[in-house]
Amino acid sequence: DALPIYKLVLSRSKTIRKDPSFSPGKAFFAAVERYIRSYVYLCHTPETGTWMGGTPEILLSGEKGDWQTVALAGTQSLRDGKLPKSWDHKNWREQQLVASYIRRQLSTLGITPEEKGPYSARAGEVSHLKSDFFFSLPNPEKLGDVLQLLHPTPAVCGLPKEEAYHFIIENEGYDRSYYSGFIGWLDPKGKTDLYVNLRCMNILPQTFTLYAGGGLLAASQLEDEWQETEDKLDTMRRIVGNL
């Protein structure tokens, strides 16, 4: 029997018209300046088209024996550009679910990580609760095993993972494309930096398609969750609208 879903991340896209004077290069450098604590990218391939995004969520980062991942969840808007002084129970609970998931997944490989946090961390126009996890991975050939265990994280899917994944596929109603995948540099013999592809956009000839999502718990207020996705979409909308 399927287990009950106790966290679910649903997302949406928003398409806006592109100004004829838009420059991807200028937008990228504007994003780099604005989102200094995020991984910012501008990527084009014939297969994927052109994508740009900024994400604060490390999926897996490290080299040799030293590795890191993060639990990033809970969202509040900045107040006068400052981090919040307190968080409600719903946001704490959401972040703790992600942290517990990471501990549990790593433990299947015999890994007990060192932890730092949770603490408030800025990401564009919003803030999140963040915990850092540091661990050793003597055999770099295990990178694929770690990635398979961590992805998709509860920050983009839900818990239990399989039940949430199938609910999203059957009910979300659109194709996420590359949103909520992971992006970065993978080098088992050198430095690897992989991030969850959160706030992002697909740059098309006449339009941008922006993507964002929000985590739903039993205590969630739907109007607040909708506004959270608006705040996240604003992160990218400000970049393309203020050049």
Can you describe what each PLM-predicted range is?
Residues 10, 41-42, 111, 176-184:
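A short glycine-rich, hydrophobically flanked beta-strand micro-motif that places a catalytic Asp/Glu
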